[in-house]
């Protein structure tokens, strides 16, 4: 049944993308499993246990949000672990927040983009829906001056017809009072991040 819903959603997102509209999601009811896949920002580095954004999102939605954040993880390395998580949890929706460590390691932009594309396609092949959380293109210089989202996330969202949660993480990092350090939110920052993700998901039809 989920595969049939996925096919309908895929057709709808392709049509909406062709029309220049934000790709839409099918509703994810309370109690469903959602996988938050990412790095230390998903894990919750910079805040106390239980103050991460996946936990805050679970409280707002009634979903069972699995925190699959691994500090230091990259889009490249994430390819080797996502399938096992999909098999184990069988999520209805996967929220992918990853790429910052790839940028810090100065990996080529196109390589990061293709690794993210691989993650998206792996998710969608299982019948789950996917969304991307845009990440700033971090570097030692940008840690000082701040920067908006890396453009490759919007490009990839358009190419793969998936919603992109933009101007959330980068906006939090631009406000010192919401940061634990230069690249991690604090507890309030994670609450704001969960609220921003919630608003985007609601607009896209997941709620």
What residue ranges belong to the model's regions?
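Membrane-interface segments of envelope glycosyltransferases acting on lipid-linked substrates or membrane lipids
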Residues: 3, 31-35, 188
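A general structural-boundary detector
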Residues: 6, 44, 65, 69, ...
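C-terminal motif of bacterial Sec signal peptides marking the signal peptidase cleavage site
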Residues: 15-18
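Serine-esterase "nucleophile elbow" of acetyl-processing enzymes
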Residues: 20-75, 79-90
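Alpha-helical cap/lid subdomain in secreted, periplasmic
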Residues: 21-22, 59-60, 80-207
């Amino acid at each position: 049944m989920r595969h049939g819903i996925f096919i309908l959603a895929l057709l709808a997102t392709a049509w909406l993308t062709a029309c220049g509209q934000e790709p839409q999601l099918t509703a994810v009811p309370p109690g469903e499993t959602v996988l938050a896949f990412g790095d230390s920002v998903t894990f919750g580095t910079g805040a106390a246990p239980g103050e991460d954004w996946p936990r805050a999102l679970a409280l707002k939605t009634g979903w069972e949000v699995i925190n699959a954040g691994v500090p230091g993880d990259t889009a490249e390395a994430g390819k080797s672990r996502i399938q096992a998580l999909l098999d184990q949890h069988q999520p209805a929706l996967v929220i992918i927040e990853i790429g910052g460590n790839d940028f810090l390691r100065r990996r080529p932009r196109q390589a990061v983009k293709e690794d993210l594309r691989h993650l998206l396609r792996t998710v969608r092949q299982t019948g789950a829906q996917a969304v991307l959380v845009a990440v700033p293109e971090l570097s030692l210089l940008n840690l000082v001056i701040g920067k908006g989202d890396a453009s490759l996330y919007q490009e990839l969202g358009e190419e793969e017809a998936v919603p992109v949660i933009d101007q959330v993480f980068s906006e939090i990092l631009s406000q010192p009072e919401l940061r634990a350090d230069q690249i991690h939110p604090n507890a309030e920052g994670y609450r704001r991040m969960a609220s921003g993700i919630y608003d985007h998901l609601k607009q896209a039809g997941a709620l």
